[in-house]
Amino acid sequence: HGDEHGDEHDEYANLIHADYVQEDAEFRGYEFEIGRTFSLGSGDLTLSFGRDDVNAEFSDGHNVPRINPSRNIYSLSYVENDWKFKLSLKDVEKQDDIGEGESVTDSYQMLNTRLTKTFNLNGAGELKVSIFGSNLLDEVARNHSSFVKKQVPLAGRNYGAKFSYKF
């Protein structure tokens, strides 16, 4: 539109104005998960460990922004008949390989659990009822790739119930 709006478009109401442009970059990383299942009682116990890590630099040597930090994920699950229990710990490392305009994101540990009972409704479908707890350590955790990580942390300790019906 015309020039009658003058400089008002130069003001961004304290928001960051960024122009993202393509640059040559090199990404290096890996992701793996190992696990083992054991018979225990009349059910199965599964233990697993996973890790992922990504490093990314532009060809001039500065860091690509919004790259998630390395994570270690420990998991334990037990399944017996119509019951399933799962406990997981996500250990997210500090991200200090930051790009232009970013800030360091602290490490955190996220402990989650879930207990699910499945009801077979004799040809009328299947009902799963779960109770869960998330962020049981009540960590202040921030998503490094979020543009609003300073203002909006991840959810604190919370509990809930979930009902799922398949027909």
Locate predicted features.
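Transmembrane beta-barrel architecture of outer membranes
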Residues: 27, 67-73, 108-112, 154-160
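A structural signal for short secondary-structure junctions
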Residues: 79, 106-109, 121-125
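Short, surface-exposed loop/helix-turn segments at secondary-structure junctions
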Residues: 99-104
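Residues on the lipid-exposed face of transmembrane beta-strands in outer-membrane beta-barrel proteins
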Residues: 32-36, 74-78, 113-117, 131, ...
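Gram-negative outer-membrane beta-barrel transporters
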Residues: 3-96
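C-terminal beta-signal and adjacent terminal beta-strands/loops
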Residues: 94-96, 117-167
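Long, low-complexity, intrinsically disordered polar/charged segments
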Residues: 39-57, 114-137
